[in-house]
Amino acid sequence: MDWKITIFTYNLAMKASDSEAVHNMLNGMIDDHTHLVAIGLQEVAHSETIGGAVLTWATTIASWMNTNGRMVLLAKTFQATNQVLIFGRKQLIGQIKRIDYRFQRNTMGGLTGHKGSIGVRLQLASPYSIVFVDSHFIHGPENYGKRVEQYHTNRNCSFPEDKSVRAAFWFGDFNFRVEEDVNTVIRKIKNGTHLELLDTREQLKRALVERDAFIGFHEQPVTFEPTYRVTVGTTEQDGKRVPSWTDRILYKGDGITGLSYTNNKKAVASDHLPVVAMFRVTAPAAPKPQWEVIFEHLPTWYTSIPLVGRFQVNELYYKENGSYRDWIGVFPSSINDCTTATNWIYAATCFEQVIEGSKFLACEFNNIPAGNYRLGYFSCHLHCLVGLSKVFQIVEQP
């Protein structure tokens, strides 16, 4: 099976989100046949992660992806001002058997994660995994050695010990710089000779060639202009920093083909330009999904009656991965976000029922408005849905 994977990295420079900025970032950048989309954001405003922001990049991106990309949110996490969002086709929900996270903090001696990395591993129904790592390393042209050191301390986020990893993608604002003066680089950009700097004066290329960092990782050919630092609202270099390709996307693994790699000059909300890459990953076909939790099909329900759903749990699942913090949620039939339900209860609050000699667990929900829904069982330890009902309808009672 071939998976098409699209990856974005965007340093937001603490700028507020709006629907136009998100549309400019994503529109035209995602192939209709893409299976997974990973988005790494750096320098997200603190108000978005600790509360206070009414509109956030994460919610606005998710809304756009649901409406325009026909994608559902599979995973989301953050560390300080860094965020990772993973989206996938709805039919892939059952192929994700486990999601794991790793974090590494580098700011203030490891006290905070403003600089650092987030690793996300998707374990598939086939015996393979896909890893995404989003990093924001220390700034400054003089800090090449510290960036290399941060790579080595952050390497654990790529799950290097896991032999099941079929493909690993490492992206973010690496902050590697061009070792040249500002005016020379700007002049080369204007006369179209800036790409020659990649082979002679660019720090990430040096790190790859000299094997100082990202050993075993590769990069598609860079054919775009430096992504930092531009004047907000334009694509013009502001001349206050040496123009550099700070924002990059690397890959490692068997059966990976790079399909495209570019910056996005339509997205000008920040002093960075976002970078987007598309890949094809060849992996063995996955077996038909086998849910750990099986829901009994629900008939049409009335809003005036508490919703009662029944399900059975695989005993081996609960023995190995079950938790009192597992929860059952009511999701819209579109399942825009696998991590957030419209209503939910802890599995520990469910009660047992015996129907015709078979044992079920039952969950109950009140005040569910009319609409089309599904019930889902979310595993606290596996960080994903391990059971999903068929669509059912709730209607107003005549």
Curated annotation (Swiss-Prot):
SMART domains: IPPc. GO terms for cellular component: axon; cytoplasm; dendrite; membrane; neuronal cell body; non-motile cilium; nucleus; presynapse. Signal peptide: none annotated. Disruption phenotype: Reduced mating efficiency. Defective sperm. Abnormal distribution of pkd-2. GO terms for molecular function: inositol-1,4,5-trisphosphate 5-phosphatase activity; phosphatidylinositol phosphate phosphatase activity; phosphatidylinositol-4,5-bisphosphate 5-phosphatase activity. Keywords: Cytoplasm, Hydrolase. GO terms for biological process: fertilization; flagellated sperm motility; phosphatidylinositol dephosphorylation; phosphatidylinositol metabolic process; synaptic vesicle endocytosis. The keyword Metal-binding does not apply. Its main location: cytoplasm. PANTHER family: INOSITOL 5-PHOSPHATASE, INOSITOL POLYPHOSPHATE 5-PHOSPHATASE. This is Inositol polyphosphate 5-phosphatase.
